[in-house]
Amino acid sequence: MAECRLIRGGEGFRGKQGLDYFAGISAESTGSKAICMHLLEMPPGASAKPHYHESHETAIFVLEGVAEMRHGSNLEHVMVTGAGDFVYIPAGVPHQPYNPSDGIVRAVIARTDPNEQESVVLLDMQDTPRPS
């Protein structure tokens, strides 16, 4: 019979994207079959590597701070998010979150991929200007 699981905060890992995540719900931590959820903390000036999640959707809830996210096939769009905002990223959409502010950004991230990093595909976009 399946059992409920408790994952205590505090342990973390560095994702392929170049950001630090606090371990949460995943196939690795709980045996989940269809969901992954983590806490992300982005220090001032932090930026993820451009990437997308193959075949998996992402939902984000911003707890604290102001972040920006470039998105689109050439990262041509910019979305500004703040505390209390929800963000939806469809599967396969390139994106790059970054923190242009002088404060920390905290967000809860959930994906329909139960694995922590399996569906992360890094993009080679070195010629694309990085956020300042």
Map each language-model feature to its residues.
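Conserved short histidine dyad/triad with adjacent acidic residue
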Residues: 38-54
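Ligand-binding loop in jelly-roll beta-barrel domains
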Residues: 82-83, 91-117
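Short beta-strand His + acidic residue motifs that chelate non-heme Fe in jelly-roll/DSBH
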Residues: 49-50, 69-70, 78, 89, ...
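Short, charged/polar surface micro-motifs in flexible loops or helix N-caps
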Residues: 30-33, 42-46, 64-68, 115-116
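A short, N-terminal "cap"/entry segment at the start of jelly-roll beta-barrel domains
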Residues: 1-34, 49, 122-132
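Conserved hydrophobic/aromatic beta-strand scaffold that supports enzyme active sites
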Residues: 21, 37-41, 59, 78, ...
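A short beta-strand-loop-beta hairpin characteristic of the jelly-roll/cupin
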Residues: 47, 56-83
